[in-house]
């Protein structure tokens, strides 16, 4: 019976000592993995930042192309409100106060010139 106790005690001591070593080893492995995870996160963050900067540059480039190609309107069409002091009606149109149905509005509109 003593040999069984000694054998059991010996197995117990070995299990505890090896288990403790495994615990320390596991702790070190976890620290390494978290450090690697942080480096992966930093890498992913930098990659995402680069992609966002490229996208922003493309969007700004498209905006500048649109503004370069778009043409500002120089005249106002028929039936469109205009300013009495600064008429910008297109050729063949005159800025006049509306008659009849347009008297309710306090604005001038571009109308065709009347040939008299």
From Swiss-Prot:
Residues 22-74 form a propeptide. Coiled coil: none annotated. Pfam families: Toxin_22. Expressed by the venom gland. It is found in: Secreted. GO terms for cellular component: extracellular region. Belongs to the neurotoxin 14 (magi-1) family. 01 (HNTX-16) subfamily. Probable ion channel inhibitor. This is U11-theraphotoxin-Hhn1b.
